Regions:
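Positively charged n-region of N-terminal signal peptides that target proteins for export
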Residues: 1-5
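Hydrophobic h-region of N-terminal signal peptides that target proteins for export
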Residues: 11-19
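Class I SAM-dependent methyltransferase SAM-binding "motif I" and its flanking Rossmann-like core
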Residues: 119-169
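Catalytic beta-strand/loop cores that center a nucleophilic Ser/Cys/Thr
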Residues: 147-207
Length: 207
């Protein structure tokens, strides 16, 4: 029973202080569109960002990152898909550019496979940047369905529109389950705690 397992709602949230922009400025977001990214996830991510009038969005490729597009962005999103393929497509030089982007105070969000990519997970192709590690990776095909989560005190600051709810709901689809890494001394803040519900093929180890 992993009752203290922490779930990041399929997202890793890194360096979000950069998202507090001045009045009149829009948050400029780049969504990675490279090998391994699921096109549906890319489309849905873009559509979600377009709902917010205070944000602009564009897709970016490995070539764009190599050519300096990050200097014109405030945040990047790595979508779901195949994390190992995205890792290879980015390459070490571009991953270091992303690390420097985050070190400078900019924002980065990983969705599903993108969340795996940001972790410090032993034996997995990842960037070691967010202080968390994925567990139970041998059961990657663990299930999907509507799942509940509750926000921590820090999570309520980040998502004030959900702060009064004891439970909120999200469509979960085989994303990572994260705990604090024990191998790198990076800050790690839990924003939400997963509350497993009935899902197709859900693994009992995580309930």
């Amino acid at each position: 029973m992993l009752r203290k397992t922490f779930f990041i709602i399929a997202m890793c949230l890194v360096g979000l202080s950069a998202w507090s922009m001045g009045v009149g400025n829009k948050v400029r977001v780049g969504v990675f569109q490279g090998n391994g990214g699921a096109q549906t996830c890319i489309w849905e991510t873009i559509a979600s960002i377009q709902l917010d009038p205070d944000m602009t969005v564009q897709t970016i490729t490995t070539g764009d990152i190599a050519n300096g597009v990050l200097k014109d962005l405030d945040a990047i999103i790595i979508p779901g898909g195949e994390g190992a393929t995205q890792y290879m497509n980015l390459g070490e030089e571009n991953m270091e550019r992303i690390r420097n982007f985050i070190r400078s105070g900019k924002g980065a969000v990983g969705i599903c496979a993108g969340a795996y990519l940001f972790t410090d997970t032993p034996g997995y192709a990842c960037m070691h940047i967010n202080g968390g590690k994925a567990i139970d990776i041998e059961h990657d095909n663990r299930g999907h369905g509507i799942s509940a989560f509750s926000l921590t005190a820090e999570g309520k600051k980040l998502f004030p529109e959900l702060a009064k709810r004891d439970k909120s709901y999200v469509m979960y689809y085989e994303g990572p389950v994260l705990v604090k890494s024990d191998s790198i001394p990076l800050p790690y803040t839990t924003m939400a705690i997963w509350k497993p519900m009935c899902m197709k093929r859900v693994m009992p180890q995580l309930t």
